[in-house]
Structures are given as structure tokens and as C-alpha cells.
């Protein structure tokens, strides 16, 4: 599974959303999240991210390892909607992301 880490917070470029063939990248308030059950591990999202925020789970830098758990837990209440485009913006973030200081200040 791919993970979106800290460089995405408060940026949300969304190039990855356009590239994803299975519509598994969801938009939270401050960050984007990859649904671990819907992602097919194709990797199309990784090279198009202009801030290099997307990593394969095993390749996530040590300082951003907590983002894997945040990506998984973000979907605890949502379940598996089966496509991000029909949901649009989700007006919340994982508490780990929500608690970060503003990244674009």
C-alpha cells in the first residue's frame, strides 16, 4: 500500500488524484489519504506528486512512519466507500494530521 506523508499536509496538490486509476485517494481537510483496501499498488501516484509526499509503505522515511497508521485509521469510520470522487472533500483529518502546526506558514 502507498502512503501519503507530511509534505502533503496543507498543500494537497491533487495531481495524484488525477493519476489514480482506481479512485482511492481521498481528500481530508488538510491532507490527502490513500485507502489501503482500495489501493492496487500500481504506483501511478508516486511520481506525479510535486512535493514527494507519496511512498510505498515499506519505503516511507522513518520520521514519517506514523503516516501509515494515520492513512489506515482515517478510514475506520468511512469504511470502504469504493471511490473518492463520489465523496468529495471529507471535512476532517486523522487526529495526528489535525494536530500538526500549519505547514504553509
UniProtKB/Swiss-Prot annotation:
Keywords: 3Fe-4S, 4Fe-4S, Electron transport, Iron, Iron-sulfur, Metal-binding, Repeat, Transport. It comes from Streptomyces griseus. Its cofactor is [4Fe-4S] cluster; [3Fe-4S] cluster. The keyword 4Fe-4S applies. It holds the Pfam family Fer4. Ferredoxins are iron-sulfur proteins that transfer electrons in a wide variety of metabolic reactions. Binds 1 [4Fe-4S] cluster. Binds 1 [3Fe-4S] cluster. The keyword Glycoprotein does not apply. [3Fe-4S] cluster binds at residues 8, 16, 49. Residues 30-59 form the 4Fe-4S ferredoxin-type domain. This is Ferredoxin. SUPFAM superfamilies: 4Fe-4S ferredoxins (SSF54862). InterPro entries: 4Fe4S_Fe-S-bd (IPR017896), 4Fe4S_Fe_S_CS (IPR017900), 7Fe_ferredoxin (IPR000813), FdxA_Actino (IPR054830), RnfB_subfamily (IPR050294). One of its GO terms (molecular function) is 4 iron, 4 sulfur cluster binding. Gene3D superfamilies: 3.30.70.20. [4Fe-4S] cluster binds at residues 20, 39, 42, 45.
Amino acid at each position: 500500500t502507498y502512503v501519503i506523508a507530511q509534505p502533503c499536509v496543507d498543500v494537497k496538490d491533487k495531481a495524484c488524484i488525477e493519476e489514480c486509476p482506481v479512485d482511492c485517494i481521498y481528500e481530508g481537510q488538510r491532507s490527502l489519504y490513500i485507502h489501503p483496501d482500495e489501493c492496487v499498488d500500481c504506483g501511478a501516484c508516486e511520481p506525479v506528486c510535486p512535493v514527494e509526499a507519496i511512498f510505498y509503505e515499506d519505503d516511507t522515511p522513518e520520521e514519517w512512519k506514523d503516516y501509515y497508521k494515520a492513512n489506515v485509521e482515517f478510514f475506520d469510520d468511512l469504511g470502504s466507500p469504493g471511490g473518492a470522487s463520489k465523496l468529495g472533500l471529507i471535512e476532517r483529518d486523522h487526529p495526528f494530521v489535525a494536530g500538526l502546526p500549519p505547514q504553509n506558514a
